[in-house]
Amino acid sequence: MNTATGFIVLLVLATVIGCISADFQGGFEPYEEEDAERIFRRSPTCIPTGQPCPYNENCCSQSCTYKTNENGNQVKGCD
């Protein structure tokens, strides 16, 4: 057995022992639904005044109107 093969065998053995140890410590228990919601919950955000807006409901002011930008183009922006 050469050095590379021995290293691979030790790496696999350490991985197997680590997985068994994690399983005994509850490392592979599934998340509860509340935990998943807490982890992936998005905080409510809104688009501030003067920024472009695709929809009215995303503006902090709940108002999105067409305005002329610095290039003379009509763009929707939050009021």
Swiss-Prot record:
It is found in: Secreted. Transmembrane segments: none annotated. InterPro entries: Omega-atracotox. Expressed by the venom gland. GO terms for cellular component: extracellular region. Keywords: Calcium channel impairing toxin, Cleavage on pair of basic residues, Disulfide bond, Ion channel impairing toxin, Knottin, Secreted, Signal, Toxin, Voltage-gated calcium channel impairing toxin. Residues 1-22 form the signal peptide. Disulfide bonds join 46-60, 53-64, 59-78. The keyword Disulfide bond applies. Pfam families: Omega-toxin. The record marks 52, 69 as: Critical for insecticidal activity. It comes from the Eukaryota. SUPFAM superfamilies: omega toxin-like. Belongs to the neurotoxin 08 (Shiva) family. 01 (omega toxin) subfamily. This is Omega-hexatoxin-Hi1f. It comes from Hadronyche infensa (Fraser island funnel-web spider).
